[in-house]
Amino acid sequence: METQKNLNTYLIHQRRYFHMHPEIGFDTYQTASYIYNELKNLGYSPCYLLNKAAVVAKLNLGKEKTIAFRSDMDALPIQELNTIAYKSTNSYMHACGHDAHMAILLTLAKAIREHLNEINYNITFIFQPAEEGPLPGGSKKIIETHLIDDIDAFFAYHVTNKLTSDSIGIKVGAACAAPDLFDLTITGKGCHASTPHL
């Protein structure tokens, strides 16, 4: 059985690896390859999606219902200025926590392997690229594959510095902001810039 200390060590190792090797958008091939191989090493049979930019692993335990856990994978086009030992090795950065999300999901997959007799659901693990863009984003593309049509409940998560590391915040429905594009037309009379509505 994995001890909590071993799982913590595994989690930290994974997070630091992902932090050092960020990729953006749908160009997450090395990240997906790493996740694919790690899941194979943990005893899963993962498959690639979206031209090998995404990874899904299904654990079919013959249960009536299926739950899914999802992690985003992509980084941002930001140059990291930190001087930490596991600093990004390229011109991108995991500045939004996706490195932690992938590490958490791999650690969950590892822990579940140790507790199969206690699991009451089939489980699907989803590693999704392009959460930060480009549109239409990775989630829509994964949905269009129909590989996740059998899921009864879906769990996603996001790290935050508003909670301590030993806490989990739960909210039904939307919990984080998301960007969107829209057009706005304002019609009015010309006038002084301080009061364009008059």
Question: What does each model-found stretch correspond to?
Answer:
Residues E2-H94, D99, A103-L106, K110-Y121:
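Acidic/His- and Gly-rich active-site-bordering loop/insert found
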Residues T83-M93, I119-L198:
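Histidine/acidic-residue-rich, glycine-tolerant segments that coordinate divalent metal ions
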